[in-house]
A protein has these predicted regions:
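Transmembrane helices with small-residue packing motifs
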Residues: 2-39, 91-101, 191, 225, ...
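Flexible hinge/switch segments at interdomain interfaces of large molecular machines
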Residues: 15-26, 62-68, 102-125, 153-159, ...
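Extracytoplasmic/periplasmic membrane-proximal domains and adjacent transmembrane bundles
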Residues: 26, 71, 97, 142-319, ...
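Solvent-exposed, membrane-proximal periplasmic/extracellular interface segments of envelope transport
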Residues: 40-112, 169-190, 211, 560-638, ...
Length: 1017
């Protein structure tokens, strides 16, 4: 049944790159076209921040105010219900009075998996206007109807509108203003319900249809003049259908295109949504031959690759574990019992994953891959003991029953200690808890299932396959050879190592102080080797994508920025042979270039190596700032490697501090791409009202501001549907006021009395320096300095920045705080170190309960310092960094490496209870337990080798865990066999030494009698 349901549910599990990590965050976006950053901050951002901070559960608020847009990021306390929080935000926003022209705030709940698009679609063709129309009318509506798609944004297209360009001289002659014309257009273009009317026995609905049907209808509209009479719109304005000035340009592999970015809904399955997008585009292209498209990025491609690679590693791990079991056992039946138990256990996990609504992602499959070697541990212990009983003369039934009973306690203890360490990881807060929740559940399911199978299915299979007579004959032959079972199984070449082990064991047992000194020396040596290990939040993951960000000087036009983006693309195409496709989106003062590389298996260089090779080639491009990063999910989760937040009230002071610190940080040898969020200030035209003069003409500030906006930017008066296409009707000036400052000052403003005055009569027009963007944190102004490191050593870089801050004289009321990757790393490391302490406590109490002793767990757990330091020793040897993944591996080791000690100490205790002295019990137990210990270790280690070597694409992140686990397992096994007897003896002697120190009158028992007493709590 387990196999049937496992296969069935395995095919039903959804796939994803990462677990569904819904962070307690939200973003509030508000658009106010034409407003400066200062206006956005004062009129939009500040009121919204005040309202947000009054909502329960809000932890912190940060905002960015830029031209026409306010963006506020909200961080909630953990376990906040985002839907309820969003509802409360809307209630607060409804009570606000934002300025006319500001759009309603849009609230978007955040999810880490939503930070990257689900799909990128490039519509190719010669006519951008036609491509835009195709995108708006056909493609986008079809994609937005897909279940799970949140939005589809369009970049690079050209839209059309009906432009009403007012002639200021002719309009003034009739006493008309742009505002008056806009209001008239709105009033004349409507469909107005009128109610019902009786027509005989029928009731008919009445509506007044005055909608414009064409551009000519708009041009021929009759305007009633304020002074009496009328005039047609075409007599005072040029009315035409035209393409709008494009805000963005997009290009794909050297061709102009319209680029669509598909984002999924929070909680929707990314792989499923991207597959639906791919199928929908294929069906659209089949139905409409005018659709020519490319898919430069599809999330499902990478997800499928990651999942298939992980599954291949799981299968390879199972095969390697089975081979090791066969090499040790040399019995087909015994090997089959082990081999069958592994897939049965994995299929059982698939059933539980479906019940708990987990997905097949890198973390859940990583848990299975890391646990494949562990699931045979219990089976090997039970199997080996059953065969030992059979070799000693027990019949098949008693060998299976009694052999299983003898090791049941140690199997349960080792299983519970292994599972216990995952509880604090899964329950830890922050990113660590969200990231490893699926991992802990799957590996916990796997290990608990392995215990059940080892104590039930394995004895059953042994009973079916065991031939006790053959086992007994094999044992006699081995006895005649006078060789240990391990030697006869693996080969004579290990005989010398085995006898060396026996000599060392005998020496350390009789020289306990030397044994303890050697153990302590190993810890000191390993720790010393690890002191230079770098620390990072997460290891990088090669997704085969490189992101190049271009910033051009203030005031740059789209064409100027596009020319630089073209040059960057050309350099990339010439110097990156691994390039599969390239696309970019260019705006007025910035551009984003994306490089898509070939599959990892088809190239020799990583995406980081490619990015490093491009950096010097692109730094020579003048007139812009360029930053290069390899795009991956872990980078988005980690934040910037260099991130410094400076807060205070005065923006000029913040700018000065940021300039000083940016220069000093940029001078650091390891720092690259260091930029400040203020950069250069933008020259801006400021119109300051003369309220007394304006009042004389009956003008308010709102009327003057609207007149300036209508003249320079224009306003959308209404919309007209022509050929099923909705077009905005935009009323604007003839552009004469935009030619110079003097022209702006001379712009006519309609007065309340029907006359006109120049703008300079009611306002002062001057050029000022203003910030391009204004950032705030918790309602205080903030400037951020960000950058990257060449080496990836965030810890060393942070130390250097702290040294700079220590020597910097910060003005009173201003603070500088390190954030980004380092802050997140410290928080996650703290959570995991706390989880490690809790895990050690759980392991101790589980062992104390199992062995009914307080000292026995101490003996078993004394192996952990050597195991931990030995595990970390492998990181600098393999060029790896200490990351959150490595720390989780250490926590896993806390519950794994003690298993060998449990088996060893439990058997020593059993032999002492049979009357043997301590030394005899140790020297008899260790050789007898070396085979199952070596078998379990080698199966666990070899099963992790594919993951540690990152065999297949996308597995770099889990590779660190495999390396740490393998190193810890190998070193801990060697140390367990040599030093656990030493630890046991030292702890066993403590009561006697304690009694001597207290000078008690109670006579000590004879040495041989004392040695025969096992350690008790």
């Amino acid at each position: 049944m387990v196999v049937i349901f496992g296969v069935m549910y395995a095919t039903q599990l959804q796939m994803a790159l990462m677990p569904d990590m819904e962070m307690p965050m939200a973003v509030v976006m508000t658009t106010y076209v034409g407003a400066t950053p200062s206006d956005i901050e004062e009129l939009v951002t500040r009121p919204l921040e005040t309202a947000i901070m009054s909502v329960p559960g809000v932890d912190s608020v940060s905002s960015t105010s830029s031209d026409g847009v306010s963006q506020i990021q909200i961080t909630y306390v953990e376990d906040t219900n985002l839907d309820i929080a969003a509802s409360k935000l809307r209630e607060k926003f409804d009570m606000l009075s934002l300025p006319d022209g500001a759009m309603d705030p849009i609230i978007v709940n955040m999810n880490i998996s939503d930070l990257m698009p689900t799909a990128m679609i490039a519509l190719m063709g010669d006519d951008l206007a036609e491509l835009q129309e195709l995108a708006e009318d056909v493609v986008v509506p079809a994609l937005e109807r897909i279940d799970g798609v949140a939005s589809v944004s369009i970049n690079g297209g050209v839209t059309e509108q009906i432009t009403v360009e007012v002639d200021p001289t002719r309009a003034a002659g009739f006493g008309l203003s742009n505002s008056y014309i806009s209001q008239f257009l709105t009033a004349e273009n409507l469909l107005y319900p009128g109610g019902d009317v009786q027509n005989g026995s029928k009731t008919l609905t009445v509506s007044t249809d005055a909608k414009f049907q064409s551009v000519e209808d708009v041009a021929n509209m009759i305007i009633s003049l304020p002074t009496g009479g009328s005039v047609r719109l075409r007599e005072v304005a040029d009315v035409r259908l035209e393409a709008t000035e494009s805000d963005t340009l997009a290009m794909m592999n050297g061709e102009d295109c319209v680029l669509l970015q598909v984002s999924k809904q929070s909680g929707a399955n990314e792989e499923e949504v991207s597959n639906k997008v791919e199928k929908r585009m294929a069906s659209l292209a089949a139905e409409n031959r005018s659709i020519n498209y490319a898919l430069p990025y599809l999330a499902s491609d990478f997800i499928d690759l990651a999942v298939s690679s992980a599954l291949q590693n799981i299968i390879l791990g199972v095969v390697l574990a089975a081979i090791v079991a066969f090499l040790f056992l040399r019995r087909f039946g015994a090997t089959m019992a082990i081999a069958v138990s592994m897939p049965v256990c994995i299929l059982a996990v698939f059933v539980l994953m479906n019940i708990f609504d987990l997905t097949l992602n890198m973390m859940s499959l990583g848990g299975i891959a890391m646990g494949v070697g562990m699931i045979v541990d219990n089976s090997i212990v039970v199997l080996e003991n059953i065969y030992r009983f059979a070799a000693e003369g027990h019949d098949r039934m008693s060998a299976c029953v009694d052999g299983t009973k003898e090791v049941t306690t140690s199997v349960i203890a080792s299983t519970l200690t292994t599972v216990a360490v995952f509880i604090p990881i899964g329950l830890s807060g922050g990113m660590a808890g969200m990231l490893f929740d699926d991992f802990c559940l799957t590996i916990g399911f796997l290990i608990l299932g392995s215990m059940a199978i080892a104590l039930t299915l394995v004895p059953l299979l042994c009973y079916m396959m065991l031939d006790e007579n053959k086992v007994r004959q094999d044992q006699i032959k081995k006895a005649e050879k006078k060789q240990n079972a391990l030697v006869s199984t693996v080969g004579g070449w290990i005989s010398k190592l085995y006898h060396l082990y026996l000599r060392l064991l005998d020496y350390f047992v009789h020289h306990l102080k030397i044994g303890m000194l050697v153990a302590v020396g190993l810890v000191v040596f390993f720790v010393g080797c690890c002191l230079t290990t770098n620390m990072v939040l997460l290891p990088s993951m090669d997704m085969g994508q490189i992101s190049i960000s271009i910033s051009t000087p203030i005031g740059s036009q789209v064409d100027e920025t596009t020319a630089i983006a073209d040059r960057v693309a050309a350099i990339a195409q010439e110097n990156v042979p691994e390039l599969e496709s390239i696309y970019y989106v260019s705006e007025a003062e910035s551009a984003s270039v994306a490089l898509i590389l070939t599959d990892k298996s088809d190239r020799d260089r990583s995406s980081d190596d490619v990015a490093d090779s491009l950096r010097p080639l692109l730094q020579d491009i003048a007139g812009c700032e360029i930053t290069i990063t390899s795009s991956d999910m872990t980078a988005l989760m980690s934040g910037d490697e260099i991130s410094l937040d400076i807060t205070g009230d005065d923006y000029e002071t913040l700018t000065m501090i940021a300039a000083d610190l940016t220069g000093q940080i940029s001078a650091l040898e390891d720092a690259v791409d260091v930029t400040s969020s203020v950069a250069d200030q933008v020259p801006q035209v400021k119109v300051t009202m003369n309220r007394e003069a304006a009042a004389q003409y009956g003008l308010t500030a709102a009327q003057v501001g609207a007149a300036v906006r209508d003249e320079l930017t224009g306003s959308t008066a209404t919309s007209v549907t022509i050929n099923n296409k909705e077009l905005d009707v935009v009323v604007k000036g003839d552009g004469s006021a935009t030619e110079s400052l003097d022209a702006l000052r001379s712009m006519s403003v309609a007065t309340a009395m029907g006359g006109y005055v120049p703008l300079s009569s009611v306002a002062n027009v001057e050029v000022v320096q203003a910030p391009q963007t204004i950032t705030r944190s918790n309602q205080s102004r903030q400037v951020s300095i960000t950058g990257s490191t060449l080496s990836g050593d965030v810890t060393a870089m942070t130390a250097s920045i702290n040294a700079i801050l220590d020597n910097y004289s910060m003005p009173e009321g201003y603070t500088a705080t390190i954030s980004g990757s380092y802050e997140e790393m410290m928080e996650s490391f703290t959570d995991l170190l706390l989880a490690l302490v809790v895990a050690l406590g759980l392991v101790y109490f589980v062992l104390a309960a199992q062995f009914e002793s307080f000292l026995m767990p101490v003996i078993i757990m004394m192996i952990l310092p050597v195991a931990f330091s030995g595990a970390l020793f492998a990181l600098p040897l393999t060029g790896r960094d200490l990351s959150m993944i490595s720390l989780v591996a250490l926590i896993m080791l806390a519950g794994t490496v003690v298993n060998n000690s449990i088996v060893l100490v439990d058997y020593i205790k059993t032999r002492r209870e049979m009357g043997e002295s301590r030394e005899d019990a140790i020297l008899h137990a260790c050789p007898l337990r070396i085979r199952p210990i070596m078998m379990t270790t080698l199966t666990t280690v070899l099963a992790m080798v594919p993951m540690a070597m990152a065999m297949g694409d996308t597995l770099e992140m889990m590779s660190d865990m495999g390396i740490t686990m393998i190193s810890g397992m190998i070193i801990s096994t060697i140390v367990t066999l040599l030093f656990t007897p030493v630890f046991y003896s030292v702890i066993d002697d403590l009561p006697r030494h304690f009694r001597r120190r207290k000078h008690t009158d109670t006579p000590e028992p004879p040495a041989d009698e004392a040695a025969a007493l096992p350690v008790e709590g």
